[in-house]
Amino acid sequence: MGEVERTRQSSSSLLTFKRKRALEACDSCRKQKTRCLAGSVEDENRACLRCRSLNMDCSLADPNHFIRKVENDNMDAISANINSKLENRLKVLEKAISSITNSPIAGQISLKSEKDVFLQGLLSMDEIELLLEIFIERYGKRWLSVDYSASQYMELLYTKSHLMLATACLIALRHNPSLKARIYTDVLNIVDRLISEELLTTSPSLQFFEAVSMLTLYRPLRLSQKQDLWLLSGFALQHRTLSSTKGWFNGFAGSSATLTYLDIVPARTWNHLCHGHLVMCMGYRRHAMLDENTFDDCRNILTNTKANEFDGNILGMLSVYSMLYRMLRSPTLDLDYAIFQLEEWRKEWCHLWEQPEPQYSRIAYFYSYNVVYEASIQTATDGNDFANIPRYVSMVQSYALKTIDAIFELSAYDMSRCSDHVLFHAGFASASLLRLIYAAKTKEVDTSIVQPKVLNDLVTKIWKWLLVISVDQYHLATKFANYLKEYQKTVNEGTAESTWFKGPLRPVSSTTLQALKPYNLGVATVERG
């Protein structure tokens, strides 16, 4: 019965929305009997989507425009019969006019809308729907809980957030080479400008947080990053904590059966944003803009009956990353206590490894052990405790291999949409193995513990895999691959100055190192002070 009620409510809501949209149709769309997607009510220029894409005057852009009622009720029935034909004609007309860029009408439209991907003639409605289909299928359903068709999602974002609309198109362009070659840089510039504007607002929209979380998971394809994503995600976290938007993320708590699917979306957005920020703290070797209360808030998602296995995966990763972060920020690394904490974590979260979802939390668990034992080598060396170093070396090798094995267990489809945190784990594990190979070649480690030939073959397999899944030369996968390939060459030549467990002093060229920044694949250390 509850399901029936929800269906009725949803249907009623949809009908109400459609009536409102029909009443607000502009003169041009009403004349053509086609759907009219008006701009946001907060926008000074409310020109509809169709008029913007065709560079036409729109009556909704007129501040004196008022809502008119349809004089003839029979017009709806007539328009229903010919609507499909008119839609086809509109598409033909749109393509014919899309090449016109110097229309005098463009100068009459407000500067606020110049960042609109439609007005600039970058993408047609068909192309945007195509990109949104890609985005929803590969990214939106998993990371943003998108439960719309491409056309519905375009409608939603066009009225609520041009930033999220541009971000979705930007990420989806990875999978459309022809469109990517044509407009990627332009769309990226739009995203940069919109982010700068949103950061100045006192209460950013929920879609702003969604856009930032997606950019932290899939950083833009460019030679060097214009936006510091660690700083951007940190600003977003502070916005949530200090501004009136905090209420969005607190309203999902509770396990009442009346909660809807959308009630959990803000909680997921918050957790994904925290996850992206914390991964960058590990990868960039920077301080986190989070505290203990933040992680308590993240756990609240489990009180929602709509939480699923992927929510658990994200929460499990947040838990182990925060634990590892605190270990590396402590004055000294207590290995026994670190192992105890990691095993306690495994007891609590290993049930996730039996789920059909990708085992991201398992990858994070092995990565954490890899880091802990590598940092322990530093601690042992500083304390002249050389007796335990062979055991630590063996464990570094073991957990680096386990990390790589877990990554290779991902499905081909999941590999094709790997987020940056998976690429980082693959890169760091491979760099750890290269440091061990180097130590064996310089006679610092017994070759009975480290087998350079086997590890070399595996590292080669890793950087070749990274190149296979890479989108272009600016993709993070390519940058990690180039780093590992060059590092491997330096190690095997054996001409670099020995620095023991830290590997060669200069394993790669400054150009390769600069391209990878701000990621740091150097040896794991305890960050004192």
Swiss-Prot record:
Q: Which SMART domains has this protein been placed in?
A: GAL4
What is one cellular component GO term in this UniProt entry? nucleus
Q: Which GO terms describe its biological process?
A: positive regulation of pyrimidine-containing compound salvage; regulation of DNA-templated transcription; regulation of transcription by RNA polymerase II
Cite the source lineage: Eukaryota, Fungi, Dikarya, Ascomycota, Taphrinomycotina
What CDD domains does the annotation carry? GAL4
Q: Which keywords accompany this UniProt record?
A: DNA-binding, Metal-binding, Nucleus, Transcription, Transcription regulation, Zinc
Q: Which organism is it from?
A: Schizosaccharomyces pombe (strain 972 / ATCC 24843) (Fission yeast)
The primary location reported for this protein is nucleus
Q: Which domain of life is it from?
A: Eukaryota
Name by which UniProt lists this protein: Uncharacterized transcriptional regulatory protein C1399.05c
